[in-house]
Regions:
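OB-fold/S1-family RNA-binding modules
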Residues: 1
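Long, compositionally biased eukaryotic signaling regions
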Residues: 4-6, 196
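Interdomain regulatory linker/hinge segments that flank or connect interaction modules
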Residues: 6-17
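Glycine-rich phosphate-binding loops that contact phosphosugars or nucleotide phosphates
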Residues: 74-77
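Short, hydrophobic beta-strand segments that form beta-sheet elements in well-ordered domains
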Residues: 60-64, 79, 106
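Flexible, glycine/charged-enriched surface loops at secondary-structure junctions
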Residues: 21-26, 189-198
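Translation machinery proteins
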Residues: 17-70, 92-93
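Long, charge-patterned amphipathic alpha-helical coiled-coil/hairpin "stalk" segments used as oligomerization
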Residues: 81-190
Length: 199
C-alpha cells in the first residue's frame, strides 16, 4: 500500500507544475479499483471523517424542529429545515433538486424521517444522500462537528473513485493523512481489501 511519504512527494510534484491561480485549488485523490464486478451490484456509499479539516468544511443541513432545530442553529448548521420547509420543497421538484445539490450531508430528527422520505426520498436516495437519523436528545453539535470534517465516497457502476482530500493552502502532510484515512477505510470495505486497488 502507498505510504504517507509517497503521497507527500506526489503532492509536492503536483504543486510544482501548477500556475498561480486566484482561487484555492482543491487536491483530489483518484483511486482505480480492480477485480470487482460493479454490474453484480457492488456499491459503496461511505462517509469518512478526515483527520484534518479542509479550509472549506462540508455543507450540512439539519432537518429538525423544536429544541434540536435551535441547537443545530446555535451549532452553526448551514441550514435548518423544518416541517413547513419540507412540505414546500415537496411541491417544487426544481427547488428540491437545487436544495439537495447545495449540501454534502443531511441530518434529520428521527421523528421527521417519514416526512423526509415522502417529500425528498426520490431525489436523495439515488444521490446517496439520505439523511443520517439523529435520535431525540442526541448531541446534534457532535454530529455536526463530525460531518463537517467528513467526505462521501461512492462507488456505483464504475471502478474509479474521485474525492477531495484538501487544497493547495494546506500542509502536504495533512493532505496525505486525509488520503491515507480514505484508503484505509476503503480497504476494509472492499471484498479483497488491498488487492482490489490497482497499483
Amino acid at each position: 500500500m502507498v505510504s504517507e511519504s509517497e503521497i507527500v512527494t506526489l503532492i509536492q510534484e503536483a504543486k510544482k507544475g501548477e500556475k498561480e491561480r486566484k482561487f484555492k485549488e482543491s487536491l483530489e485523490l483518484y483511486i482505480t479499483l480492480k477485480d470487482i464486478d460493479v454490474k453484480k451490484g457492488f456499491a459503496l456509499n461511505e462517509v469518512i471523517q478526515l483527520p484534518n479539516q479542509m479550509s472549506k468544511p462540508a455543507a450540512v443541513c439539519v432537518m429538525a424542529t423544536g429544541d434540536m432545530g435551535l441547537k443545530a442553529k446555535d451549532a452553526k448548521a448551514d441550514e435548518v429545515m423544518d416541517n413547513d420547509g419540507l412540505d414546500k420543497l415537496a411541491q417544487d421538484k426544481r427547488a428540491s433538486r437545487k436544495f439537495i445539490n447545495k449540501y454534502d450531508f443531511f441530518l434529520a430528527d428521527t421523528k421527521l424521517m417519514p416526512l423526509v422520505g415522502k417529500s425528498l426520498g426520490q431525489l436523495l436516495g439515488p444521490r446517496g444522500k439520505m439523511p443520517t437519523p439523529v435520535p431525540f436528545n442526541a448531541p446534534i453539535e457532535s454530529f455536526l462537528s463530525r460531518f463537517k470534517t467528513s467526505i462521501r465516497v461512492r462507488v456505483k457502476n464504475s471502478l474509479s473513485i474521485t474525492c477531495k482530500v484538501g487544497d493547495v493552502t494546506m500542509d502536504e502532510h495533512q493532505v496525505a493523512a486525509n488520503a491515507i484515512a480514505i484508503i484505509n477505510n476503503l480497504v476494509t470495505k472492499l471484498p479483497n481489501g488491498n488487492k482490489n486497488i490497482r497499483k
